[in-house]
Structure formats: structure tokens, C-alpha cells
């Protein structure tokens, strides 16, 4: 089977310099959703017709299995499909999709493809309570499709028809070239419409069949930011419903955003306003607090992530405790039972089993062993203005508050670092490290008094 995806439109009503098909739905371009669905049908040829912003669109979705045809002038959907003809296998049927209709299920498309086997012409239709504005499917007394009539051309009787054309079709490819060549642009827009092909197919004696989606929203397209927002909510609702079916506890399914793939184990609980991006895995008994953002991360069983935590590219072991207001950046690896508390940032660092950094700390480019206590206000000074260096803190170290570790530096096993210490040289195992300081208390001191104006 050939699949052609039309993605050449300007999208004027989006009021944006970004090509319409590149506007994000759940964090990914609209067109990417359509391509992914198309791939599940395993086409032999997958062709995207580009036009407005062609180079930008091609760069966004380029892949070895995707070919591109260019529609230099936007002269209608029929003209767009014609540009793809040289790239198609004429011996196989062609399925035509739209780059701004992202939620059509693969099962729906397969149903249409199956209906159109043996050289039939297939149309995906949907029955609406209010079909205003859509082309109607006209059938004869025997129920066979005879034509598609647009709203402006429909008779009062035809306007009562609730079955409408979605634009998604399956057509014999060998005949498609002839039919497209016979299209006329005698309409207000001066364009060649793919919908006109159905009458040519009927005139040529081809049987026209239809299939319908399970849900109306599968055929909704995007022509404005309002419609994009509507589809975003539909998509997120579908994701939330699937998570609930799988046993995930959602404090409010309407306040969850998944912009990628979220895999959850048993008894996972997610509070409100959480965003998951990229590939995220939550193991059994993970609890996520409110207003967290988690991107490309794996979270071990029994972990608790408190509110307002931001995690990006991190790996968390089992029974870790994170947040609130913590930030784990790419390369952060936490072993089982590690704690990272409020206003702690970890970047490209390993924190060992049971180690804790509970308050106001920066840990960057570091290797921290097991059972280490990092006091509040500790900083690994990893950057000299030109290069990054690593800090190594071995097992069972106690780091007092307000400590600076100037990398590259190593702190041996069992070391105790006094509060307010700057470490710039390696410290051997078991020692106490401190900077000698003198405390002075003076009598007779009088605080300044604010002058009265």
C-alpha cells in the first residue's frame, strides 16, 4: 500500500510563521502523529506532500522511510496528490491522509483499507449531529454512494444528510493518475479538489465503499489555535483514561499532560498539574506530587517525588525521596534510598545508596558514595571558567553546611568536613577537614539607629 500525507497548506488561521503541520500536539508536531499512525499500517511507500515551509517541514520529519513531493503552488488537494504520483507504486492502492488530522486511529484506517480491497474506492465518513459546513455523502435508494456534494451546492433535501466526507480515502493508484488529470478547477477557489475524484470513479464503474471511525474526534482537523487546543484536551483525556484503566491513580485526569510516552507500574499515584515529556518510566508504588515536570527519566519503585520538582534525563533508584522544589538535570543518577531535598540541584552526578542532600545544595559533575550526608549550602565548584572538573566523595562522609568543594578534588571514606569549609585539596580517609577560623566577640558595640526624617 502507498500512503500519501498532505502537508503543504499555509495555515493562515493559525496566525503563525510556523507551518501548520509543525505546531505541537502533546509536545510533537501534528505531522509526526500522522506519520507514526501511517507507519503502523506498514506501507511500501510513504510520501509527504510539502509546500509552505517545505524545507522546515522536511527537516522536522525526515526519516529513511519518508519520501517528499513538493507542491510549489497550493492549487488544491487534488493537485497536491498529483505531485506524489511519480513516487507511488501503481500496482498498490493509495491511502490519502492529512497532516493536520492527527488523532485518527490506525484501526480505523485499517477498516477503511479492508473495505476498499479488490480495487474499490474507499471513503472515510462520519455521521454528525450537526453536519453544517461539511460535504455530504449522497447515496442512492440501494445505499450506494453516488457523489459528494459540498454544503454550498447542496439542495435542501441534501442538507438534511448527516453523513459527511472526512477527506480520507483509499483509491486504486493506476486509475488515480487519469482521474486527477481529468479534474477541473471551476470553483470559487480555482482549485483542484480531491473530493471530485469520487464521481469520476463512479462514472468509471468502480464501487465506492465507506467506513466510519469509532469516535468523531478521530477526524477532527486543525485550522486554528482554538482547534489545536481542543485536540490537545481530547488527546490528553484519552491518555488519562488509558492510565486509569491500567490502574494509575490520577488526582484529576483533566490536569495531566503527557507529551511523549509514560509507562507506569502498579499503584502509581500522580497529583495535579504534572507534565511528562519524552520517555518516562515510573515503577511500582511511585508517588508524584503536584506541579512536577518529568522528562526522559526512569523512577524506581517506591520513590516519592514531592511537589514542584523538575527532573530531566535522570535515573532514580528504588525508594528515593525527591523534593519539593528539587531539580535533577541530565546525567543525575540516584541509587536506592537516596534523598535530594528542597532547592537542591544535581547535574551529571552519581549519588550513592542512602546518601542525602536535603537542602540548598548544588551537586554537579560529582561521584558521591553511599551513606554520605551533604549539609545545607554545599556547592561542588566544578567550573573554572573554561572546563568542568569532577568531585569525588567516598562512602560515609559527613559534609557540614556551607562547604565548597573546588574540583578536581577527592574526599576519602569516613571524612568529616566542618561547616563553612572550603576543600581544594584531596582529603585522606577518616580525617576531619576544616578551615581554621577565629571567632571574636566584642563588648561595647552599639547598633546603628535609623535617623528620623
UniProtKB/Swiss-Prot annotation:
The keyword Lipoprotein does not apply. Residues 247-453 are annotated as: N-acetyltransferase. One of its GO terms (cellular component) is cytoplasm. It catalyses: alpha-D-glucosamine 1-phosphate + acetyl-CoA = N-acetyl-alpha-D-glucosamine 1-phosphate + CoA + H(+); N-acetyl-alpha-D-glucosamine 1-phosphate + UTP + H(+) = UDP-N-acetyl-alpha-D-glucosamine + diphosphate. Keywords: Acyltransferase, Cell shape, Cell wall biogenesis/degradation, Cytoplasm, Magnesium, Metal-binding, Multifunctional enzyme, Nucleotidyltransferase, Peptidoglycan synthesis, Repeat, Transferase. The keyword Repeat applies. GO terms for molecular function: glucosamine-1-phosphate N-acetyltransferase activity; magnesium ion binding; UDP-N-acetylglucosamine diphosphorylase activity. It comes from the Bacteria. Pathway: Nucleotide-sugar biosynthesis; UDP-N-acetyl-alpha-D-glucosamine biosynthesis; N-acetyl-alpha-D-glucosamine 1-phosphate from alpha-D-glucosamine 6-phosphate (route II): step 2/2; Nucleotide-sugar biosynthesis; UDP-N-acetyl-alpha-D-glucosamine biosynthesis; UDP-N-acetyl-alpha-D-glucosamine from N-acetyl-alpha-D-glucosamine 1-phosphate: step 1/1; Bacterial outer membrane biogenesis; LPS lipid A biosynthesis. Residues 226-246 are annotated as: Linker. It is found in: Cytoplasm. Mg(2+) binds at residues 100, 223. PROSITE patterns: HEXAPEP_TRANSFERASES. Catalyzes the last two sequential reactions in the de novo biosynthetic pathway for UDP-N-acetylglucosamine (UDP-GlcNAc). The C-terminal domain catalyzes the transfer of acetyl group from acetyl coenzyme A to glucosamine-1-phosphate (GlcN-1-P) to produce N-acetylglucosamine-1-phosphate (GlcNAc-1-P), which is converted into UDP-GlcNAc by the transfer of uridine 5-monophosphate (from uridine 5-triphosphate), a reaction catalyzed by the N-terminal domain. NCBIfam families: glmU. In the N-terminal section; belongs to the N-acetylglucosamine-1-phosphate uridyltransferase family. In the C-terminal section; belongs to the transferase hexapeptide repeat family. This is Bifunctional protein GlmU. It comes from Burkholderia lata (strain ATCC 17760 / DSM 23089 / LMG 22485 / NCIMB 9086 / R18194 / 383). The lineage of its organism: Bacteria, Pseudomonadati, Pseudomonadota, Betaproteobacteria, Burkholderiales. The gene is glmU.
Amino acid at each position: 500500500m502507498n500512503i500519501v500525507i498532505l502537508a503543504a497548506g499555509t495555515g493562515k488561521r493559525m496566525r503563525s510563521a510556523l507551518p501548520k503541520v509543525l505546531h505541537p500536539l502533546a509536545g510533537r508536531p501534528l505531522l509526526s502523529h500522522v506519520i507514526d499512525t501511517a507507519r503502523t499500517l506498514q506501507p511500501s511507500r510513504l510520501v509527504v506532500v510539502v509546500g509552505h515551509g517545505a524545507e522546515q517541514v522536511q527537516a522536522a520529519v525526515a526519516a529513511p522511510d519518508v519520501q517528499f513531493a513538493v507542491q510549489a503552488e497550493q492549487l488544491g488537494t487534488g493537485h497536491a496528490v498529483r505531485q506524489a504520483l511519480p513516487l507511488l507504486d501503481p500496482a498498490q492502492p493509495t491511502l490519502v491522509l492529512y497532516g493536520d488530522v492527527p488523532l485518527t486511529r490506525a484501526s480505523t484506517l485499517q477498516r477503511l483499507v479492508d473495505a476498499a480491497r479488490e480495487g474499490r474506492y474507499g471513503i472515510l465518513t462520519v455521521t454528525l449531529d450537526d453536519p453544517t459546513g461539511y460535504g455530504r455523502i449522497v447515496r442512492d435508494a440501494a445505499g450506494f454512494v453516488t457523489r459528494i456534494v459540498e454544503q454550498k451546492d447542496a439542495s435542501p433535501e441534501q442538507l438534511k444528510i448527516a453523513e459527511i466526507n472526512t477527506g480520507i480515502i483509499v483509491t486504486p493508484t493506476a486509475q488515480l493518475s487519469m482521474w486527477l488529470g481529468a479534474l477541473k478547477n471551476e470553483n470559487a477557489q480555482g482549485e483542484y479538489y480531491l473530493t471530485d475524484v469520487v464521481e469520476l470513479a463512479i462514472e468509471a464503474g468502480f464501487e465506492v465503499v465507506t467506513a466510519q471511525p469509532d469516535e468523531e474526534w478521530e477526524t477532527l482537523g486543525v485550522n486554528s489555535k482554538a482547534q489545536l487546543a481542543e485536540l490537545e484536551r481530547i488527546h490528553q483525556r484519552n491518555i488519562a483514561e488509558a492510565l486509569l484503566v491500567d490502574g494509575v491513580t490520577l488526582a484529576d485526569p483533566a490536569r495531566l499532560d503527557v507529551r511523549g510516552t509514560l509507562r507506569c507500574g502498579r499503584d502509581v499515584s500522580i497529583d495535579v498539574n504534572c507534565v511528562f515529556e519524552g520517555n518516562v518510566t515510573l515503577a511500582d508504588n511511585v508517588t508524584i506530587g503536584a506541579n512536577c515536570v518529568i522528562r526522559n527519566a526512569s523512577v524506581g519503585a517506591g520513590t516519592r517525588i514531592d511537589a514542584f520538582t523538575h527532573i530531566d534525563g535522570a535515573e532514580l533508584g528504588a525508594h528515593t525521596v525527591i523534593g519539593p522544589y528539587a531539580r535533577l538535570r541530565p546525567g543525575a543518577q540516584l541509587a536506592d534510598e537516596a534523598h535530594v531535598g528542597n532547592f537542591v540541584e544535581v547535574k551529571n552526578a552519581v549519588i550513592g545508596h542512602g546518601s542525602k542532600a536535603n537542602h540548598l545544595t548544588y551537586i554537579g559533575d560529582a561521584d558521591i558514595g553511599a551513606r554520605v550526608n551533604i549539609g545545607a549550602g554545599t556547592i561542588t565548584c566544578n567550573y573554572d571558567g573554561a572546563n568542568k572538573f569532577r568531585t569525588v566523595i567516598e562512602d560515609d562522609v559527613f559534609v557540614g553546611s556551607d562547604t565548597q568543594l573546588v574540583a578536581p578534588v577527592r574526599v576519602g571514606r569516613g571524612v568529616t568536613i566542618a561547616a563553612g569549609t572550603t576543600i581544594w585539596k584531596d582529603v585522606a580517609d577518616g580525617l576531619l577537614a576544616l578551615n581554621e577560623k577565629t571567632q571574636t566577640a566584642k563588648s561595647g558595640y552599639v547598633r546603628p539607629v535609623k535617623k528620623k526624617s
